C-alpha cells in the first residue's frame, strides 16, 4: 500500500474515468501508467483491489446518468440482456485463458490497439449510411452479435470493451450516437459481473490507511466518467470516431516503444 500515493490514486482514477467509456482501451492506458509510475500491479494485492474500486466508480457514473431511463424502458433492458448473454458465455469459458495467458501480454496489447483503430476508421465511414438510429430498432440477432464483439474484446487486452461494442454497433447498422450509448449501457451488467467475479476469486486486501486511497480513486473515476460520457455523445455527433481511431494507432506505437524494445 505504501507504493501508491494520494496523487497517484487520483491520477489513476481520472485515467480510468476518462478511458473506460472511450474506444481507446482503458487497460492499455492503465498498464502504461502503472509502468511509468513504477507500480507493480501484478504483484501488489492492494493495487488489484484499487483497480476494482476505480472500475466501480466508472460504472456508477453510467448508473447515475441512465438509471431513471432504464427503470422505465423494458425494451432497452431486453436488448442489454440479449447482448450480455454471449458476453457472459465467452467470459466464463475463457476466463482462465484471459487471466493466465493473454492478460499482460504486451505484444497483444500493442497489436490490438492498432488493429481495432484501423477497423474503427472503416466502421466510422459506414456510420454515415447507418440504418438504425436507436438500438431498440435493431433486430435482436444483431444485438446479440454486439455481445459477441464485447466478449471477444475480453480475450484480447488492448481491444477495449467500449471499442469493441461501438465497433460492433457501427458494423451492424447503428449510427454513431446509438452505438456509443448502447456501449455505455452494456457496460453495466458486464462490468458488475467482471468486478464481482474478481472479488469472489480473490478477496480484497485493504491495509491500514488504504480506504482513503480507494475512496479517492473511486470518486475521481466517478466524476471523470460522468463528464466523459456526456462529452463523448456530443463529440461523436460532430466528429465521429475517426479521432479516437487515429489516437489508438498512435498509442500503439507509444506502447510498443515502452514495452517491446
Swiss-Prot record:
Q: Name one GO biological process term.
A: regulation of cell shape
Q: What are its GO cellular component terms?
A: plasma membrane
Which NCBIfam families does the record cross-reference, listed alphabetically? undec_PP_bacA
Name where it mostly resides.
membrane
Where's it found, cell-wise? Cell inner membrane
Residues crossing the lipid bilayer are 9-31, 46-66, 80-100, 102-122, 137-157, 180-200, 209-229, 240-260
Q: Decide whether keyword Membrane is in the record.
A: yes
Signal peptide residue numbers: none
What's the stated role of this polypeptide? Catalyzes the dephosphorylation of undecaprenyl diphosphate (UPP). Confers resistance to bacitracin.
Gene Ontology MF annotations: undecaprenyl-diphosphatase activity
Keyword Lyase annotated = no
Cite the entry's keywords alphabetically: Antibiotic resistance, Cell inner membrane, Cell membrane, Cell shape, Cell wall biogenesis/degradation, Hydrolase, Membrane, Peptidoglycan synthesis, Transmembrane, Transmembrane helix
Other remarks in the entry: Bacitracin is thought to be involved in the inhibition of peptidoglycan synthesis by sequestering undecaprenyl diphosphate, thereby reducing the pool of lipid carrier available.
Reactions the enzyme catalyzes: di-trans,octa-cis-undecaprenyl diphosphate + H2O = di-trans,octa-cis-undecaprenyl phosphate + phosphate + H(+)
Gene label: uppP
Question: Which family would the database say this protein is a member of?
Answer: Belongs to the UppP family.
InterPro entries, alphabetically?
Answer: UppP (IPR003824)
Q: What is its EC number?
A: 3.6.1.27
The membrane-topology field of this record reads: Multi-pass membrane protein
Report any Pfam family annotated for this entry. BacA
Protein name (record):
Undecaprenyl-diphosphatase
Amino acid at each position: 500500500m505504501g507504493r501508491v500515493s494520494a496523487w497517484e490514486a487520483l491520477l489513476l482514477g481520472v485515467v480510468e474515468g476518462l478511458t473506460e467509456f472511450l474506444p481507446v482501451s482503458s487497460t492499455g492506458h492503465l498498464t502504461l501508467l502503472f509502468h511509468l509510475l513504477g507500480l507493480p500491479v501484478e504483484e501488489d494485492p492492494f493495487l488489484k483491489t484499487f483497480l476494482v474500486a476505480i472500475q466501480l466508480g466508472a460504472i456508477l457514473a453510467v448508473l447515475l446518468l441512465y438509471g431513471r431511463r432504464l427503470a422505465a424502458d423494458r425494451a432497452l433492458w431486453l436488448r442489454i440482456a440479449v447482448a450480455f448473454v454471449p458476453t457472459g458465455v465467452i467470459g466464463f469459458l475463457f476466463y482462465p485463458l484471459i487471466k493466465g495467458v493473454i492478460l499482460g501480454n504486451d505484444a497483444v496489447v500493442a497489436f490490438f490497439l492498432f488493429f481495432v483503430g484501423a477497423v474503427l476508421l472503416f466502421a466510422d465511414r459506414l456510420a454515415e449510411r447507418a440504418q438504425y438510429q436507436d438500438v431498440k430498432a435493431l433486430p435482436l440477432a444483431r444485438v446479440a452479435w454486439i455481445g459477441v464483439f464485447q466478449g471477444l474484446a475480453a480475450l484480447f487486452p488492448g481491444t477495449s470493451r467500449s471499442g469493441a461494442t461501438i465497433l460492433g454497433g457501427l458494423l451492424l447498422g447503428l449510427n454513431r450516437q446509438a452505438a456509443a450509448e448502447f456501449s455505455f449501457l452494456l457496460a453495466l451488467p458486464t462490468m458488475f459481473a467482471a468486478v464481482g467475479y474478481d472479488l469472489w476469486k480473490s478477496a480484497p486486501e485493504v491495509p491500514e490507511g488504504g480506504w482513503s486511497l480507494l475512496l479517492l480513486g473511486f470518486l475521481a473515476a466517478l466524476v471523470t466518467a460522468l463528464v466523459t460520457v456526456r462529452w463523448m455523445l456530443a463529440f461523436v455527433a460532430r466528429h465521429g470516431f475517426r479521432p479516437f481511431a487515429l489516437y489508438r494507432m498512435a498509442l500503439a506505437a507509444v506502447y510498443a516503444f515502452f514495452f517491446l524494445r
